[in-house]
């Protein structure tokens, strides 16, 4: 399959779990997830050719990933840095999200995710991987490729 866009909470799970699976249960923002969820997430992502991110998601993950004490924080930040270096960034102007009709309901970042889903790069469409049920439904209604992570749990 083509590239996948991973939403904030799942990207946080991916980064924290990649640093150490034991950090998942230590991180307050990941209380609804466990190591099995991390394994499922890795399996789903492996089906795609690349992970694509937007700066807005990375800023959110950066702030959330730091909400744990050292030495875990340091290890997570190093893993996050490595991820940033390896993944593909697609810069989208905030105005693209603000101009979408979904902006008022979903906010800037999710509106930008939908905007990215609407793009077609050299015949390759982006798919969205999310744990946000409302966002998944909206993406599906718009005809975008979407995987609702909660359906895999």
What positions do the PLM features span?
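Acidic, PIN/NYN-like endoribonuclease modules and their adjacent C-terminal/linker elements
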Residues: 1-5, 19, 97-106, 114, ...
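Generic detector of short, locally flexible boundary/turn motifs and exposed helical patches
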Residues: 16-20, 27, 89-95, 112-113
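Residues that scaffold the ATP/ADP-binding catalytic core of kinase and kinase-like folds
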Residues: 13-14, 64, 138
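Alpha-helix capping/helix-boundary segments
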Residues: 10-11, 57, 112-113, 134-135
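Short, well-structured N-terminal submotif of metal-dependent ribonuclease cores
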Residues: 1-53, 68-72, 150-153
